[in-house]
Amino acid sequence: MVKKMNEISPGRYRESFGRYYEEFVVGDIYEHRPGRTITQSDNIWFTLLTMNQHPLHIDDEYGKGTEFGKTLVVSPFTVALMVGMSVSDVSQKTVANLGWTDIKMTHPLYVGDTLYAESEVIEKRESKSRPDEGIVTVKTIGKNQDGIEVASFIRSALIPKDGKAVEDKIDY
């Protein structure tokens, strides 16, 4: 988590989160903490919220009859948690998410597992149309408590340059 304290007047500080475009270095890896232990309530809630009622995610008896032997955590929840875990390191200052590609679910995630995530900066370039911003691309990997990769994706975001973020402009 990137957290800074900015002095806004003598003896008074305001916290600031996230990275400016210039602070991203290709090859750097950010380990996102804390991890998140998945509960049955998390899984049921997300399946119902998104109207994904496949029994593999909500019916223990059905899950017992599958090759997995139990219910699985619904995949979009895994991805959503990984995105959320990465916000403070990758996209807290983002102007716009430009998209996700190469989303892969590589190993089952089960209720009771703890999900961890990390993001590697794989590319960055200045925006051709927005001189105060740049495009940063990261590969985010989710792992369970045993270090087994469960999911990955590539994400690109439009990031402001130093001093050009919304909070810089409005004294936030």
Show where each model-derived region lies.
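Basic side chains
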Residues: 19, 36, 104, 124-125, ...
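Flexible glycine-rich active-site/ligand-binding loops centered on an Asp-His dyad
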Residues: 133, 137-143, 148-165
